[in-house]
Amino acid sequence: RQMCIRDRHNRTLDQTLIPKIRKILKESNKFPKFIVVHLMGAHFKYENRYPDSMKTAFKSIESDRILTQKQLIQDEYDRAILNTDYVITEIIKSVKKYAKHSAVLYVSDHGEELDDLERLGHNEDFATKSMYDIPFFLWQSEAYKNDSILFFDPNRKYMTDDLFHSLAEILEINANEVDFTLSLIHISEPTR
């Protein structure tokens, strides 16, 4: 089953996915569920990525002065990230409520350049560290942790090219194409 609310040029709010995710989670647990959610997150234009109720959050400290374009963009980005945090939290709460033996893996597809307005956003032709240094975390339910031998080291260096191997390990899939040494949750150091 596939759902798409994506419209990167217009206002698209990720929280519209939350009720749909809950509906899937409430369905019969006869078979395991694997749900992939691709959020708009903080894709430019940032002001289209959060609800009106967040418009006053993260007003620049210097709000009594006229803000620079850079400060305005950074405030909009911070609000988009706040909204992404809210959506991820709601997804985890829903998974925790409806799927006792579960895990949620979050990874951003890229970061954004905010300091150099000439390179605003993300562009592989003008890549900066902030475009490649991205959030990545694994939440596990208590039941999942108790039944699992997974070890997650959040400080390990990792390339998202190897996400396939981490997903295979989480889902306990063995195949010739899987190299568990490239998994972020595998105990040994990755070979890259």
Place the predicted regions along the sequence by residue.
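Catalytic domains that recognize anionic headgroups
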Residues: Q2, R6-S188, R192
